[in-house]
Amino acid sequence: MDQLRGASVFPKIDLRSSYHQIRMKEGDISKTGFRTRYGHYEYVVMLFGVTNAPAVFMDYMNRIFRPFLDKFVVMFIDDILIYSRTREEHGEHLRVVLEILKVKQLYTKLSKDEVKFLGHVISAEGIAVDPAKVESVLQWERLRTVTDIRSFVGLTGYYKRFIERFSEIVAPLTQLTRKEQPFIWTDACDRSFDELKRRLTTSPVLVLPDSGEPFDVYCEASHQGLRCVLMQNRKVVTYASRQLKNHERNYPTHDLQLAAVVFALKV
């Protein structure tokens, strides 16, 4: 999402029946055969569910859009996100993308200026968490196994840039995933679980940074971890945090503060 800084127009193009737009090699068609009571059938286009289909399709899309990736195009399988600073610039970007699709005979459908992409909602105001993902987190019942914890932490961790002090809040849960750690659900785990849900439902809209404007970086260190927030024009661009490594727990205060500065500058 960092490529989108400074942009304000975000159309998304979805390819129709994406895999079916790639023809099978002649020698592989017979491998897809199946029989029904109506007869024998074989796929002449790439079918959904094949192990290598996503990789093959992604490789093809990356090759045809390679000159424009991270300039004004972001690709994820059959989703093409175009980002532009102005509507005039957007017109040229859209023309280039549509021309490539026309030449390659790929058929599409267009989305609106506010689009959902990789679990985020992107608009001129910034980036927000997809409400559908928030709903799935809210419906999560109490975690009863290490696998449950890893799944929950993995999903909420995907949105950690929206959550201030994420690493500190999640610490009681990650503690239970460590090797040889007995699974004992405590009040601290309950508070962590509930707080992560609350933070996701109240997460801010993160602004898309403008490289031409100054940034403000705020950082903090404690024995609970390192934390920082990147802001621009008094609006949050991203939160970041991490737990301390074992050797860092022995740092004196001034070294911890310096570690927080280094961590913030690497975000």
Q: Would you name each region that the model predicts?
A:
Residues 1-37, 105, 112, 148-172, ...:
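Amphipathic alpha-helical blocks
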